[in-house]
Amino acid sequence: MHKQPLHVATLGGVRFHHAGAFWFGVVLVTAGVIAHIPMYLMGKDIGYRLAGMPMDTPMLIGMGAIVVGFIASLYGLYPPSSATKSRIASHVRVRALDDAPLSWAHVGLLLTMAVAVTIDVMKPTALAFVMPGMTLEYGLKSPLNPTGTVPAAWLALSGIVGTVMGSFLWGWLGDKIGRRASILYAGIGFIGTSICGAMPSFEWNLAMCLLMGIAVGGMLPICYALLAETIPARHRGWLMILIGADIAGAYILTSWLATELVPTYSWRILWLIGLPTGVLFVMLNRWIPESARFLLAQGRDDEARKVMARYGAVVVEEKESELEIESDVKNQWSELASRQFLGVSLVVGCLALGSGLVLFGFNLWIPTNLRKLGFTESDAILRNAALMGFPLTFVVAWMYGFWSSKKTIILLSSLTAIALFGFVIVGDAVVQNRALLYALLIVPIWGISSVVAVLSVYSSEIYPTRIRSRGTGFAAGASKAGGVAMIALVVFGIAAPSIATVALIGAIPMTLSVFLVFFFGIETRKRRLEEITADEFARAA
């Protein structure tokens, strides 16, 4: 039986190489952020405007403490090399995780993850409420200040570039040190990057926004990987999609905080809130056990047994390992392009890129395009389209979990492509028919969010345990890549493309995705993860 090294401490399935180093790092990061608060308070009498102020000594010391804290906490989480190179095929029955009934432990995990997702999504959501105040304080160029020199969109670009980097970085990290440990490290990142609220210069705000994006972009994919490996197969699909729908709660909470706090404490308070929410995030992680599947794949049977017992799974050993099918899967990025997974990786990559181009292209430019065409009620139209489409989220969850995951993706992608081609055909004349405008808008406004949610769940199901975090990270990163291109157009002052142009840019990859899913997609509905992997190996043989 695999024994743990004596110098390793464990907490609910998380392996700490040095527990003292980890918690020392958390304290250092928190203290470093607190050292920035006096700088923020110095601006109280001038509306908390810090632009142009020099950094004081406590801030510089605090920044050093944060850097050291990040290094120390990662060292505390990083497992010994022997734990990451195990090729032992555990004989513990993995099927027991899917045979277990949905218990209060599962419900607790789902609720905790819903809160975690809300905290995570609050970060990029806050950007919309931060931009007006930051634009005025730093004299940035935007519709609020057309005479500015530096485009305000640089902030959004740095953030989304960070999310792309974070998706791939955390994808690697999640497969290296574990799902829960990676989520915990993202929480520490939330704490540290909250100093953005005390940065006096716009350049430092850009740097902090990039780092914040890295933490945000990495956490969500790992959450989906953990849920996929923990929730019983018969409930996995629909429950995970509903967790993704919790994003709406983040928008509501952030808008409420902005309304209540920004008029008094300025836009900076929305970044500084990252300190208490980040600490809460770390504390919540105590109720998120490590993935038993990840532990078994690492040969850490003793820890896996404890996690399985927590979820009511009967721990039974079998003569032949159910994980043997994954024994030849290498823990590296190149596996995503291997013969067994190339087809599904093409599906994920194309669908992610297409959804990103629609989300950050069509949906980003549609308010501007409608106003250019004289439609002064564009904001109300977009809001109404989103509200009309929201109830359909529950229909999608049912379809994915009880009808067919593959057919659901094909249907959503087809509807999105058809609606976008409708805009291509009708063009600017669409504003002359309000009923047609609403009909065409509902799908890309609501539907693309459903596509992103379904893609996140699907990518967590189709890759084996050894590379599951990389797979979900790849899906998340590819979906943001389109956003990088579209927001860059704003930064460099390129005129807004027409409705027909941005619709065509999104319609082409969405149409291609339909064919890729049809030919290379694999059905995941109510199927065990190991069964899905075995099917992929059989198809590639």
Residue ranges and their predicted role:
Residues 1-9, 41-45, 62-99, 287-341, ...:
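Intracellular cytosolic loops and amphipathic helices of Major Facilitator Superfamily
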Residues 235-265, 272-281, 476-486:
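Glycine-rich segments within core transmembrane alpha-helices of 12-TM secondary carriers
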Residues 167-178, 392-405:
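Helix-to-loop junctions at the C-terminal end of transmembrane segments
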Residues 125, 159-168, 251-252, 389-394, ...:
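Residue-level signature of mid-helix packing/kink "hotspots" within the transmembrane helices
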Residues 181-195, 408-422:
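Structural signature of the two symmetry-related core transmembrane helices
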Residues 48-56, 130-164:
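Extracellular/periplasmic helix-loop-helix junction of adjacent transmembrane segments
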Residues 36, 115, 121-132, 337-394:
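Extracytoplasmic gate region of multi-pass secondary transporters
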Residues 198-208, 263-266, 425-439:
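Helix-loop junctions at membrane interfaces in 12-TM secondary transporters
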